[in-house]
């Protein structure tokens, strides 16, 4: 066996282990949401690849305007693990990022957070994600992580800023406002968001 083949074998094994961990995390996430009473898919009876609706079908399909925020989560996790665990195999850093995103999805879909969104934002029609949407959000973070791993930091920062501005213009919401309104709501932001 050549030295190149021997050198690539541990790397492939780590990626394989990372992929298995990611699949296990996604399965646990979906199961947790199911047993917590979340609906599997949109009650409309279809699964759309994209839903631009901000009303009843929001967060019920595979992707929506908030998918942009989850891709940015992936960028942030890549940068975080590059700083705190730069020598860890990329596949394991990816699995850790997916684990954090999955935990966030479970928290985001808890009754406490759903009610907080409904009370403190313009999202009065938000009743939580479908399981399809929640798992797709985690996959979006995974994609964001992989994009950040491949592209120069300047490019991913530019993409993140573009996504934030685009969502702000189109739906008057984005990751930054979402965090602000979750942690310390401002009535003037809520009123502005309600003006759509």
Curated annotation (Swiss-Prot):
GO cellular component assignments: plasma membrane
Cell compartments where the protein resides: Cell membrane
Keywords associated with the record: Cell membrane, Membrane, Transmembrane, Transmembrane helix
Membrane topology (UniProt): Multi-pass membrane protein
Pfam family, one: DUF2585
Transmembrane parts of this sequence: 15-35, 65-85, 127-147, 151-171
Alphabetical list of InterPro entries matching this protein: DUF2585
Keyword Iron among record annotations: no
Keyword Transmembrane helix found: yes
Family from the record: Belongs to the UPF0314 family.
Protein name as catalogued: UPF0314 protein Oant_0840
């Amino acid at each position: 066996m050549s030295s190149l083949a021997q050198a690539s074998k541990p790397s492939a094994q780590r990626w394989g282990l990372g992929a298995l961990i990611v699949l296990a995390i996604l399965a646990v996430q979906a199961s947790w949401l199911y047993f917590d009473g979340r609906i599997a898919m949109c009650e409309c009876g279809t699964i759309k690849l994209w839903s631009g609706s901000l009303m009843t079908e929001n967060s019920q399909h595979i992707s929506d305007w908030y998918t942009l925020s989850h891709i940015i989560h992936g960028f942030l996790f890549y940068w975080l693990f590059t700083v705190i665990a730069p020598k860890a195999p990329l596949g394991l850093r990816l699995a850790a990022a997916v684990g954090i995103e999955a935990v966030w999805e479970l928290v985001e879909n808890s009754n406490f957070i759903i009610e907080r969104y409904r009370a403190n934002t313009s999202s009065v029609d938000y009743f939580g994600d479908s399981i399809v949407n929640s798992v797709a959000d985690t996959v979006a973070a995974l994609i964001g992580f992989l994009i950040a791993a491949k592209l120069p930091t300047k490019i991913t920062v530019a993409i993140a800023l573009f996504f934030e501005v685009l969502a702000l213009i189109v739906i008057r919401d984005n990751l930054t406002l979402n965090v602000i309104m979750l942690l310390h709501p401002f009535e003037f932001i809520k009123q502005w968001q309600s003006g759509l």
